[in-house]
Amino acid sequence: MVLSRHVTADKVLKEAREHHDKHNSHRGRAPISELLGRDEPGQLQAHPLSDRYETEPIAKYKLSSQGMPDKEAYDLVTKELSLDGNPLLNLASFVHTRMDEYADRIMHENRAKNLIDSDEYPATTLIHSRLISQLAHLWHADDQKEDATGTATTGSSEAIQLAGLAMKKRWQARRKAEGKSFKEPGPNIIMGANAQVALEKFARYFDVEARMVPVDESTKYVMDPKRAIEMVDENTIGIFVILGSTYTGTYEDVGEMARLLDEYQAKTGIDIPIHVDGASGALYAPFATPSLIWDFRIPRVVSINTSGHKWGKTYVGCGFVIWRDKQHLPKELVFELHYLGSVEYSFSLNFSRPAAPILAQYYSFLQRGFAGYRKISLSDAKNARLLARALERSKYYHVTSEIHHLKDPKDQSLVDRAKQTVGALDDIELYVPALPVVAFHFTKEFKREYPRIKQASIQHLLREHEWIVPNYELPPNAEDMEVLRVVIREGFSEDMVERLFTDLINVTEQLMDEHKAEAPNPGEGSGRNVSEEKKEKDQGKQVGKKLTNVAERLAASHGEGTRPIGHDGPC
């Protein structure tokens, strides 16, 4: 959750009025609230007919002494929420935003169920157990004949804390058994500087030193196992390896990290486990690239987490963590509960949690099956490659992510090479395994020619078209580079890729036109901007030409002729 500071309404409103008065006195006008004629700018305004029910204004920052009719409250909330972005067009988020009618019914019909109450909801508890088994099987715990165990969580952030705690407790037990201190110098955990904040939270919240492996262009902005192994010592409780970086979608190399740790153990006798942060990748990679070995097939991987509400295709609030066997989940972390009607075992950071998202995950697994998830995953990857290629063909952008890169020849099989030779480039096995994420930035040539254009302006201009595309700095040691990022999720079709690309190129060229326009020299008066006159003269012609160019670029990246893009106009 985002932390929110308590707002003292009277104090804030007083300061706001004083600020407006002071700020606007320099401009010679009255405060905004006075111009609007608002006597109570700190109050919510209800429907004009609501005064028949009300005895006082509706407070924003404190509980009103009187309520209001349900319809009025509903209208007030929905009107405020209308200013939120459209979840489907929120390309910043990895979180799934749409389920079908029957999933919605399951969510609605089971919204009152508490997952912790297993005695009251035995069928729900059974479904939870089945999900743990299904995930363990998907991640090949069965292949290793392991007695896997796990639990549902509210998401990967909680799952990461649980996995980290298990590794810390096992490290402490080992230190005690060896007669060594577990307090000085204390435990450490290793992760890339590209780690999502939940991984850093574990270290800070549970007093573990976070050793951040520097990342840069040479490491593809993810953790390099060779750099990570240099930070390992006897106090390392484990290594977080990320299957799908938040920044670029790139997978970290689980197999290579395990190999180096095997060598380290052979030399020192110190056994250091791996936890795979598969928040996104653990429910994408098994379907998109099942030949990729990253899971429990690697003996050093002791636990894996994932978010069902990402590529598991459920609404937010669904996550899981699985341990390869019971010995990697210390008994002292598991609580035995006797006050819910039966004996229950729990390992979580909170007690109550909604059952509905977990039931929706079960429905999604049943409804899609492996084939359905694979079909969606392949479509997501194809659309991500389409967008990435189009961006690079535009000559304005360089794509940092790797979803569209062919594998290094040394990593290709004979079949892969044969497919590449005959031009069968739609096979995902030919490409570098990665999430369907497109991270990109201005090319060096573009920056040289248009030095005053800020990349952040693209984010703001796209928002005018309702697209939510973040512009952010890369991790420490690479923070001088900013990237824009698009996450391709289910429902983001090829047509939507075309529409996004069209808008992106148009706003880019809009900024280019503004950059080229020369302002009048001092002493020439307040003449009009050159580009404004040009736009008035042939605006329709320029827009038509621009859209045609966009269509040609996208079609070229897709291997087809130019196609009509009539949907770009208003219906």
Predicted regions located by residue number:
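Non-catalytic terminal extensions of PLP-dependent enzymes
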Residues: M1-Q144, L165-A166, W171, R175, ...
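Conserved PLP-enzyme active-site core in the AAT-like
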Residues: V2, A9, I32, G37-E40, ...
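A short glycine/serine-rich beta->alpha loop
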Residues: A59-K60, L115-D119, K145-T154, T306-G308, ...
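Structured loops at beta-to-helix junctions and adjacent beta-edge loops in soluble globular domains
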Residues: E80, F94, G192-N194, I242, ...
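A short small-residue
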Residues: M107-N114, I237, V241, A360-Q367, ...
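Secondary-structure capping and boundary motifs in well-ordered enzyme cores
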Residues: A123, A152-A159, M191, A195, ...
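Alpha-helical scaffold segments in soluble metabolic enzymes
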Residues: R130, Q134, L162, A166, ...
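Active-site C-terminal subdomain of aminotransferase-like
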Residues: P286-P436, F440-F446
